Design a protein with these regions (language model features):
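Canonical positions in the second alpha-helix
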Residues: 47-48, 80-81, 113, 177-178, ...
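Canonical tetratricopeptide repeat
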Residues: 60, 92, 126-128, 191, ...
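Helix-start (N-cap) detector for alpha-helical repeat units in TPR-like alpha-solenoids
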Residues: 22-23, 55-56, 87-90, 121, ...
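Structural marker of alpha-solenoid helical repeat scaffolds
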Residues: 50-51, 82-84, 116, 181, ...
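Terminal, low-structured helical/coil segments at or just beyond the last alpha-helical repeat
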Residues: 125-161, 368-400
Length: 400
């Protein structure tokens, strides 16, 4: 497993030279920054820039320099991004000058960003810790006195907030007002789909979003919501296509790979699922979630040896997590390796004794090892924890 992960990491780092898709090394760069390795992220983007002068590479390298505290280099890269795509680096420049407590310059660049296609939402700006030093500055107060957002944008933000807090009735009221006043606005269409999803009307949401994306094919928010609605409606094939569209838009979000892998697993495209997960593991080699998903995908395809390699790596990395032992125990259980299954269920129960399913499966494993008395102890534990499936085994093996 270690050899696999080393190869994956190496192949992602050298992806530029191999001429593969840029979204994967953008994801890698983001992962390196998140993992506290901004220097490695900057080096990766430097290699990318040798192959192609792309604004997204400059922007990500600027973020890496910012994370290192190298503000001068970050400013240079944000300005380089601006030269390739006007205004693309203005928000980053605003953040740097805010961190430096230079309110006039920070607000100047923020206003340039707000007048461009790269404008951030009010929530994004207000929750960005970079601007915390400006909160009591007059320039900051003056900035927020201006009308930066349209009525549909404000209404959409209110709808998002009310849905997030469970106030669906108020979200519906705001949407009805919005739709009557601005029926053709893209924010109205998105809000309509958002309300439909909150009401579990997934087909309505999918229909609305498909119509909107026909006109605005690169709208990231709509694509993300479409993928979620497709998954919720039981259409993993459609969702995988939506996640692919997001990835091909160079959205530097590694979680898209995990979401797409989950869809591939549901459609039986196991190799595609494992490919996505292994790419993700190249970014986050110790991810419990990814190792678990990779093992389950391999197990579903009938490759138990491959599954066990992932599950064992997860146990090694996360020895105090009961779910890692359960994953491996389930794999042993499916392959009828009863002794190993019983051992791993036992390890999980040492960490989480309230898992009735683990008690039941450990009991079944022990029965198959001929240890009926020990098995009955486990069946009773499962029953006492509310597992009704244990009654069949209790009556068959334990009641004389």
């Amino acid at each position: 497993m270690k050899r696999i992960l080393i190869y994956i990491t190496f192949s992602v780092i050298t992806v530029v030279a191999a001429g593969q898709k840029p979204e994967y090394y953008l994801m890698k760069g983001k992962a390196l920054i998140e993992s506290g390795k901004p220097g490695d992220a900057a080096a990766l983007m430097t290699e990318a820039l040798k192959e192609k002068q792309d604004a997204t590479f400059y922007l990500l390298r600027a973020e890496a320099f910012l994370a290192k505290g190298d503000y001068s280099s970050a400013i240079d890269d944000f300005n380089s991004a601006n030269k390739l795509i006007p205004s693309s680096g203005e928000y980053g420049l605003a953040r740097i000058y805010a961190i430096r407590n230079d309110a006039p310059t920070a607000v100047y660049h923020l206003e340039l960003s707000m007048r461009s296609a790269f404008r951030k939402s009010e929530k994004e700006i207000l929750t960005d810790p970079s601007f915390s030093l400006l909160e009591n500055r007059p320039e900051w107060r003056q900035f927020w006195k201006k009308e930066w957002y349209t009525t549909p944008e404000k209404s959409m933000a209110e709808i998002e907030y009310n849905i997030s807090t469970g106030n669906l009735a108020e979200a519906g009221n705001i949407f009805r007002t919005l739709s009557s006043a601005y029926p053709e606005d893209v924010n109205t269409a998105y809000s309509s789909a958002l309300v439909s999803v909150s009401e579990s009307k997934y087909s309505d949401a999918v229909k609305m979003l498909a119509q909107t994306l026909a006109e605005f094919p690169d709208n990231e928010k709509c694509l993300r919501l479409l993928a979620s609605a497709q998954e919720a409606s039981g259409n993993p094939a459609g969702a995988s296509l939506s996640y692919t569209r997001l990835i091909e838009l160079n959205v530097p979000d590694p979680e898209l790979l995990i979401r797409r892998a989950g869809c591939y697993s549901k459609t039986g495209e196991t190799e595609k699922a494992v490919d996505d997960i292994e790419t993700y593991l190249g970014f986050y080699p110790e991810s419990k979630k990814a190792l678990s998903l990779a093992g389950k995908a391999a197990s579903a395809s009938g490759d138990n040896i491959r599954a066990l390699s992932y599950f064992s790596e997860n146990v090694r990395l996360h020895p105090n997590d009961p779910e890692c032992f359960i994953d491996r125990a389930n794999s042993y259980f499916m392959s009828r390796s009863w002794e190993w299954a019983a051992r791993d269920y036992g390890m999980s129960l040492d960490l989480q004794p309230g898992n009735s399913e683990a008690w039941l499966n450990k009991g079944i494993s022990l029965v198959n090892l001929g240890k009926t008395e020990d098995a009955c102890f486990n069946f009773r534990k499962a029953f006492n924890l509310g597992n009704r499936n244990s009654t069949e085994y209790l009556s068959r093996y334990c009641i004389k």
